[in-house]
A protein has these predicted regions:
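Alpha/beta-hydrolase
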Residues: 63-64, 68-154
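Catalytic active-site module of serine/aspartate enzymes centered on a nucleophile-bearing elbow/loop
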Residues: 178-213
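Short beta-strand immediately N-terminal to the catalytic nucleophile in serine-hydrolase-like folds
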Residues: 18-20, 46
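Short, hydrophobic alpha-helix immediately C-terminal to the catalytic nucleophile
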Residues: 29-33, 202
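Flexible "cap/lid" loop of the alpha/beta hydrolase fold
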Residues: 33, 39-85
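Gly/Ala-rich beta-loop-alpha elbow adjacent to hydrolase catalytic centers
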Residues: 20-24, 28
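Conserved loop-alpha-helix segment in the C-terminal half of the alpha/beta-hydrolase fold
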Residues: 139-189
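Conserved acidic catalytic loop of the alpha/beta-hydrolase fold
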Residues: 1-16
Length: 213
């Protein structure tokens, strides 16, 4: 987080508007609780203040999936058989429900389990989160700054998709903890509202920036 402050100072940017999505949303929150005086505003999409909360909600989504998804994932993980085609199919099902619901997938989506190999997952992602979104084993799984949200003092917009893997409960927690925060949930969207409903996505963010600028 301090690196971002040094970069901002070196570039002589003054206060900035900060946007973070997904894991960038986690970082966005972590930065704001320490350095909100450097921010004109911040926008967090599909972020959280608590990895344990995010993981708990993702495990709930797994449990609520069709039985074959839950059974296959639990069995293959217990056996260490993550490259099993049945496991890949089950993980893909969750991605299609909670990461991008468009069918067919847009050409720039290249990170579904059926499109890659778990063994080829980026090392940083693997260490910090895991081999895929719904199997969090990385070293950031205990990160939690929920009790510091009251320190955020800049205008804040919190957004997510109704069917987001980082569920609305995460965004609602952020919204409650940050004074004057605004919350928008994109209906019929999951983790990628910029692709699933771009008109609404840009309208919400444009209106927020116009108001706080």
């Amino acid at each position: 987080m301090s690196r971002r402050s040094r970069e901002r100072a070196a570039l002589k940017l003054g206060k900035v508007h900060m946007y973070g999505v997904s894991f960038g949303g986690f970082l966005n929150v972590g930065y704001a609780v320490k350095y909100s005086n450097n921010l004109s505003s911040r926008m967090t999409q599909s972020g959280t203040s608590s990895s344990p909360l995010a993981i708990s909600e993702m495990m709930r989504l797994r449990r609520e999936a069709p039985g074959w998804v839950t059974e296959t994932m639990d069995r293959c993980e217990a056996e260490g058989d993550l490259e099993n085609p049945e496991y890949v199919k089950a993980a893909d099902y969750l991605y299609r429900q909670h990461l991008c619901r468009l069918d067919p997938l847009p050409p720039d989506i290249r990170w579904f389990p059926s499109q890659t190999k778990f063994r080829d997952v980026n090392l940083v992602y693997r260490l910090m989160w895991g081999v895929h979104e719904f199997y969090p084993t990385g070293n950031s799984k205990y990160w939690d700054v929920t009790n510091q949200l009251g320190q955020v003092g800049c205008p804040t917009l919190v957004t997510c998709g109704r069917f987001d893997e980082i569920t609305p409960k995460n965004s609602e927690t952020l919204n409650r903890g940050i004074r004057g925060s605004r919350l928008h949930i994109f209906e019929n969207c999951s983790h990628t509202p910029i692709l699933e409903d771009p008109v609404a996505f840009f309208r919400v963010h444009r209106d927020f920036l116009q108001e706080v600028s």
